[in-house]
């Protein structure tokens, strides 16, 4: 069965180009020029991945990303921004909203397909088929689920991989570059600053006090370590 990808792009020529190359790569593709319609259909069909332009009718792509991340049915689906906005501030904002990759226009169709495949691989395969029980924190790698004190915590695919990787090496200090190599192997999207963004997002989700984290500790001048209780 082919994986379904939703492309939300109001430029007809770009949408056709993206659809053509993704279908050659054996994906099923649905194209939307309107954010509101895309979200309604996404709740029904639950696509494997979203490709979003930022500037689209019916609500911008950033708001659509927020809506996807707040949806019980869609929150774990990977999101790639495909946009003409190439500034660092736009990239960081995309990260903070939960995007898994960011491709700027103009782009190579071949690279686009490669990046889609890379993101789907990261989403589909947890690092280790096991369960971490760490105090109040529960990480189920088989089911790709996180809970704190029994309450489910919604994470993106990349957030899950980062948390899983750190939890499998408690006490070990990782530099930002080491985490980039281990968790984001296949993408040029992230920078050392991006790691900080993901750590902050995870702290907000799993820590009782994100300003004084119990699990995800900062080691000044070196990077981060996971502290097992």
Briefly describe each language-model feature range.
Residues 2, 46-48, 73-78, 189:
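His-Asp phosphorelay/catalytic-motif detector in bacterial-type signaling
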Residues 9:
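Conserved acidic carboxylate
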Residues 13-24:
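Charged docking surfaces used in two-component/phosphorelay signaling
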Residues 26-34, 41:
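Short hydrophobic/Thr-rich beta-strand motif most characteristic of the beta2 strand and flanking loop
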Residues 45-51, 56:
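Active-site beta3 strand of CheY-like receiver
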Residues 66-71, 76-133:
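Basic, amphipathic DNA-recognition helix from helix-turn-helix-like DNA-binding domains
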Residues 145, 150-215, 219-222:
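Positively charged, aromatic-enriched patches within helix-turn-helix-type DNA-binding elements
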